[in-house]
UniProtKB/Swiss-Prot annotation:
GO terms for cellular component: endoplasmic reticulum membrane. SMART domains: GAF, HATPase_c, HisKA. This is Probable ethylene response sensor 2. Belongs to the ethylene receptor family. Ethylene receptor related to bacterial two-component regulators. Acts as a negative regulator of ethylene signaling. May play a role in the regulation of flowering by up-regulating GI (GIGANTEA) and RCN1 and regulate starch accumulation by down-regulating the alpha-amylase AMY3D. The chain crosses the membrane at residues 24-44, 59-79, 94-114. It is found in: Endoplasmic reticulum membrane. Expressed in anthers and hulls. Its EC number is 2.7.13.3. Its cofactor is Cu cation.
Length: 635
């Protein structure tokens, strides 16, 4: 051979070395190709879910065929037969077919595999997001736990100072604060005063003007507000930071219902007042306020406001209870005094009643005995007047002295048939001597339709007429007094000042209307509402016309018992007065013989039964300065 040829001699020692290395390499390649499918089959069987099993089978077949070609290649390094060449050719052809099919399948599989990677990234992001949410949830749970604990501590008492002290201490312990303080409004409301701190590192009572911009900023927000560490509100500790200033926040605390709320003597505050809570983190640290810590402070501030409101309401309730107890004690003492006074009054009335009834019975008895003797008509009229006056005085004594009986409503009417005309005759006989002393004329007019007999309480009716007519005579210096009696019309039963009076007209009953009119001193509009009160005296009555002041009050009570109504009318002082009353009386079907015998003589105009000149009577006034007057008959 030519010396320039770069060929390897077949029998050269180097050829054997290369063949040897190729032989070994093909062997290990074939071994690796055969082991890879076994590993794939093993892990696929172990996998519970794998969507590309046919791809793995094709890929395994491709690897096996590749390994087979390398294995068959081991026999080609020496002289080999045609059979080996055929087998090698078939193996390579099969490998080519399988590799092409696998390559085509990978065109569809690779995008899916890429999507799997994207899904993996998406799931990883979702997992990270879930981790963050779980962290937030854990933080919220922790915050809620702290809020529940703080709320429990705050609401464990209803003392306002204890509430504030507990709030600051628990916040400082939960949030690891360097200091926590509360600024309260002063009495004037123009400044904030330091009232509570945790460690008392600042002077209690320090004052900050309320018109500072930072204070207005805190008041105008219901959230936590970050304030500079150099702010006057942040001057709650004496410790100064060397390197990093502390983080300081403030929040307003509404004073919802705090009256008498002040420092040591808490001033009265309106419902729109605010306190300021200041919270400071430790200085010289990299710690900052986190969102859940801010939320915790906001919730606690609201709880403190509610707790302070409840405490204030409780204190007000306790003050009201104490005041009520004092009033009850005073009322109980007054009740005991009133009971003692009532007992003393009843004892006095009982004694006076007994002492007045004893001589009254003697007068009635002697008058009754005199009526049984031979008397002239004039003497008999005088004795009858004495007897009736004594009987009426006994009735008046019973009513006036038994005040408790009148006040508790236990007074009852004595219903019986009586002669109605005779009642007016008796009234005239009683009042005409008094009118004659004052030279007053008394005119009595009885309507023709007025029945002769009626059913009711004659003594009470007579007492009403005497009280009203007696008042007219008492307050009239000159002129006349007229008494008019008739059956009342239904439309005239209501007085001008009694809109709530509703009379009931029924069969067998009628309303007696009595009008007493005088030309006396009259009643002023100011005195009109007080005329029916007990012990009431008109200002224009004068000291000579003073009396007990019970007449009209008793008359109104009797009129009410008789289902009637009474009122007064006057145009003013010096223009006279008109008294009008209605009482309900029964109408008897057949008057008995006694009533017929009691029928009086008809009253003549301007004259009562007997006339003024037919009497000789002594008249005594309740005023001791009025002299005794004796009116003697001129006949």
């Amino acid at each position: 051979m030519d010396g320039s040829c770069d060929c390897i001699e077949p029998l050269w020692q180097a050829d054997d070395l290369l063949v040897k290395y190729q032989y070994i390499s093909d062997f290990f390649i074939a071994l690796a190709y055969f082991s890879i499918p076994l590993e794939l089959i093993y892990f696929v069987k172990k996998s519970a879910f794998f969507p590309y099993r046919w791809v793995l089978i094709q890929f395994g077949a491709f690897i096996v065929l590749c390994g087979a070609t390398h294995l068959i290649n081991l026999w080609t390094f020496a002289i080999y037969t045609k059979t080996i060449a055929v087998v090698l050719t078939v193996a390579k052809a099969a490998t080519a077919v399988v590799s092409c099919i696998t390559a085509l399948m990978l065109v569809h599989i690779i995008p899916d595999l890429l999507n799997v990677k994207l899904r993996e990234r998406f799931l990883k992001d979702k997992a990270d997001e879930l981790d963050r949410e779980m962290g937030i949830i854990r933080t919220q749970e922790e915050t809620g736990r702290h809020v529940h604990m703080l709320t429990h501590e705050i609401r464990s008492t209803l003392d306002r100072h204890t509430i504030l002290r507990t709030t600051l201490v628990e916040l400082g312990r939960t949030l690891a604060l360097a200091e926590c303080a509360l600024w309260m409004p002063t009495r004037s409301g123009s400044a904030l005063q330091l009232s509570h701190t945790i460690y008392n590192s600042a002077a209690i009572g320090s004052v900050v003007p309320i018109n500072l911009p930072i204070v207005s900023k805190v008041f105008n927000s219901n959230r936590v507000v970050k304030i500079p560490h150099t702010s006057p509100l942040a001057s709650i500790t004496a410790d100064k930071s060397r390197y990093v200033p502390p983080e300081v926040v403030a929040i307003r605390v509404p004073l919802l219902h705090l009256t008498n709320f002040q420092i040591n003597d808490w001033p009265e505050l309106s419902a729109k007042s605010f306190a300021v809570m200041v919270l400071m983190l430790p200085p010289d640290s990299a710690r900052e306020w986190r969102p859940h810590e801010r939320e915790l402070v906001e919730v606690v501030a609201d709880q403190v406001a509610v707790a302070l409101s409840h405490a204030a309401i409780l204190e007000e309730s306790m003050r009201a209870r104490d005041l009520l107890m004092e009033q009850n004690i005073a009322l109980d003492a007054a009740r005991r005094e009133a009971e003692m006074a009532i007992c003393a009054r009843n004892d006095f009335l009982a004694v006076m009643n007994h002492e007045m009834r004893t001589p009254m019975r003697a007068i009635v008895s002697l008058s009754s005995l005199l009526l049984e003797t031979n008397l002239s008509a004039e003497q008999r009229l005088m004795v009858e007047t004495i007897l009736k006056s004594s009987d009426l005085l006994a009735t008046l004594t019973n009513d006036v002295l038994d005040v408790s009986k009148l006040e508790n409503g236990s007074l009852e009417l004595e219903i019986a048939p009586f002669n109605l005309h005779s009642t007016f005759t008796d009234v005239v006989n009683l009042i005409k001597p008094v009118a004659a002393c004052k030279r007053l004329s008394v005119v009595v007019t009885l309507a023709p339709e007025l029945p002769l007999h009626a059913i009711g309480d004659q003594k009470r009716l007579m007492q009403i007429i005497l009280n009203v007519a007696g008042n007219s005579i008492k307050f009239t210096k000159e002129g006349h007094v007229s008494i008019t009696a008739s059956m009342a019309r239904p439309d005239a039963l209501r007085g001008p000042h009694e809109p709530d009076y509703h009379p009931v007209v029924s069969d067998g009953f009628f309303y007696l209307a009595v009008q007493v009119k005088d030309t006396g001193c009259g009643i002023s509009p100011q005195d009109m509402p007080h005329t029916f009160r007990k012990f009431a005296h008109p200002e224009n009555a004068g000291k000579w016309n003073s009396g007990s002041g019970l007449g009209l009050a008793l008359s109104r009570r009797f009129v009410s018992l008789m289902e009637g109504n009474i009122w007064l009318e006057s145009e003013g002082v010096g223009k006279g007065c008109t008294a009008m009353f209605f009482v309900k009386l029964g109408m008897p079907e057949k008057p008995n013989a006694n009533l017929r015998r009691m029928a009086p003589h008809p009253l003549q105009p301007n004259q009562g039964a007997g006339g003024p000149d037919a009497l000789s009577i002594s008249i005594m006034d309740s005023n001791p300065r009025v002299p005794r007057v004796r009116y003697q008959s001129s006949v």
